[in-house]
Every structure is written in structure tokens, then in C-alpha cells.
């Protein structure tokens, strides 16, 4: 170690994730009539609707919406205020939408401009004449998550290069040129991904890792033709979770009824285990889709959106890890890392090989934001091992080491239902660690830093396993025993000792300590 001063620069495991999603939409300029706003939400409270969507998925603060009723007012607002997104509802009364978009971008180069139509007749007319002027065009279908979808699609497009480069955030490509269909798909895809990501937060060891997981959710990128889809695949091949595509869409400037199948063939030739879902209104396409090792979904199905959600959940690593045999027979389920490790130790070797050959383990880890662990597993092939038992041993030991590393130097939020005795430093209850607890936590983190480990050869310095009862639990103890008033009065040591000795612990805290 060159200098003890270097320790001042040490960072937490999640510090490198802090720069994820650097671009966030904070202010939206919305151009609409009052009636159009009423159509979006019956009571007209668009901001409340957006706030509720952000709260549902535990997202950071929702953007502010500034509404104007004309293109002229919008251009004036762009000159005087900062906005990250412009949304135009239907057509404008005082200016051609394409002309408005050009002027808006002249004032604010690079600002995303999105058109939201209400009727198919508006949509066709607008797309025919002005589509190139807009970043995206959507049609309002009554989906309350539409506004959230537009925001996240724009943010993903801006952030994807940096976020994949920095930590390997994963990407899902949607290929669809029908505004009606992608206006239905995208809200469902974002809702499903955010819902599953939120569900994973209960597995996080503390609030820092919870924040990381929300920032590290997969990005969704939209392509409307073959060339754009192929370009996205080639750029983000290393980070792809999967592809969801129509079969019929433009290729070489002309509508091609086999474009999706050709795209799947090209991708599967290079990444054979990548999940691909192809969709068509023509059931006869199913056999051709099967021939290129992709899944098929009929667009005319009454359960289209439900089946799409099931595909995302099953193939992109969300939900429980379900150990199956090659014939689909379910053997066991793992809800968390400990259960995955336990199952890996005993599950049928045929199931272990089946999942390893398809990168199911690394996909499941990636969905949980565990990119480093996934990178340890993904390069290894089944053929690298002498037999399935050597594969089992490697997987078990890698998971065991990871669980230990994951706890090292970290303050873990105690949860009775998932406590397994591996945590080195626990916090029990809500609130602050307190001064002494915070000092111990800092020293524990410091001693797990590599610079300290190598500073004194032959010497191991560590903090004993620790549990800190936080201020929230202490406040509950004081309140339950009516000790707050007592503490504020003047009493001698014997009286204070007697009062606290005779007090009882809150039942929740007592159960935590017994665990």
C-alpha cells in the first residue's frame, strides 16, 4: 500500500452504480388542450397520476409537468425554462407538428419530442406527414402507465450507452412498427420489469443495494425496422437479455413478411441461447419460428398481453429460479441466493446441465443486479467441466463465496424470515445506527477494504460479528414503557437502573433477538 491516505478514496460496492441513469427527466413540457388532458385522466390531475405510478414502483421523484395550449406558448416556454422532454397531444391548432418539432429542437438541440395521438385516424395522418420529426409516436389506449412508459423509454435511450459500459446493465430489444401494438406492449413490459425489480428489493441486504437494483433494471430499446434492430443487436449483443419482435416489418425500405424470422436466424446463429419471442397474426408462421429456435405468440390471442408478461417473467430471469428437467418437469424452486445454493447441491444433474447450457443462472443473477457474479459464471461452459458433479461443485462454491463476499463490510438489514447466520454486521429495526454503531460499521467496512488487508502482512484485523439495535427500536422500547418522561426528569443511578431493568422489550424486537 503506497499510503494510508489512499484509504480516503475507498468506496462502497454500490458506489460505481451511483452514476447509473445519469439522465433523468425532471421537467416535461406538455402541449395540449384541457379536453385532451381530461381524456388522459378523467379528473384532469395528470401530475397526480404520474406521482402514483412512480410511488407504485418505488421510483425516485416524478417529473414536474408544465402544460401549455399552443405551439407558440411552448416555444416561448422552451426559451425561458429548462425541459428534458416535450410531449405533443394530437395535432396543434397554430402550427404544423413537424414544424413545431423542428423549431423546438433549434431552440433546444437534442431535446426529445414525442407525439401522443388519441385516434387511429389522427395517427395515420400524422405518421404519414410528420413521423420523422418525432422521436416516438404513441397512441393513447387508456393505459394509465403510458406517460411513465414514454418517460422511461426516452431515459433508456439516452442512458443505455453509459450504463452498459459502466456496469453491464442489460438490454431488451422490442422490434415493432405498429404504433398500436407497441403502445400496448411497452407499458406492459415496463410495468412487468419494474414490478419484478420491486419484488426483488426484499432480497436486498440494505437500502443501498435496493437503490442499486432499481437503477440497474434492464433497459428497453425500440426498433421499427430491420436495419435499426440489427444495429441495436450488434451494438448491445454482450448485454442482451432477449428480443421481442414482430415478424412483418420494414426491411430495406419495404415491408417484409419474413423480416422477424431472418432477424432471429441471424441472432441465433451467433447467440444460440438468447431468448427470442416472435409475434404474428398469422398462426401459420409458428412452424417457421420454431425452426429458428424462437418462441411464437399469436397477436390475435385474447391473452396476448398476459402471455407476453409470462414470457418476460420466465425467460429474463425474474421470479423464482425454477429447476426443471429438459422435458419441462419442475423439480425445485429457489427464491433467493441461499435457496439457489442449497438446490444446486442436491438437484438432479440433468437439470443442472440443462440450465447451465442456456445461461439461466447468469440471467437470473443479472435480473437481480448481480453483474459481477454473473460475469464469473457466464464464460464457463458445461464442456469446461469433467462431469456434472464438477459443475455442481463449481456452482455451489461460487455461490457460497459470493454470499460471504456480499456480506463482508456491509451493514445488513435484519429480516427474520431470511436470516441465515452469515451476516457480519446486522442492523435491527428502523432509524439510525447511533454514534457507536456507526463507528463500528465504518471500521468494519475499512477492515474489509483491500488496502487495509495488505497493509500489515501476516496480521488479520477484523470486527467481531455485530448486531446493532437502531434508534427506531429504542424509541419503541421507550414509548412502550413510558420511559421518555422519566428520562427527562432528574433521577439517581439506582432509580434509572431499576426503571430500565423492569421494562420489557417490544414484542417485535424480542422476536428479532430470539431469531
Segments (PLM) and residue ranges:
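Conserved phosphotransfer microenvironments
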Residues: 6-10, 39-51, 60-62, 67-75, ...
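N-terminal beta-alpha lobe that positions the nucleotide/phosphoryl donor
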Residues: 334, 339-342, 347-348, 352-515
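Non-catalytic signal-transmission and effector/linker regions of two-component phosphorelay proteins
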Residues: 1-66, 102, 130-136, 140-219, ...
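Hydrophobic/aromatic residues positioned on beta-strands within the core alpha/beta folds
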Residues: 116-118, 279, 299
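Proline-centered loop/turn at the N-terminus of a beta-strand
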Residues: 110-114, 136, 171, 274-277, ...
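As written
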Residues: 97, 127-137, 288-296
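Short, charged/polar "capping" segments at the starts of alpha-helices
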Residues: 37-40, 121-125, 182-183, 284-287
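Cofactor-binding loop segments of dinucleotide-utilizing enzymes, especially the Rossmann-like FAD-
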Residues: 33, 70, 118, 177, ...
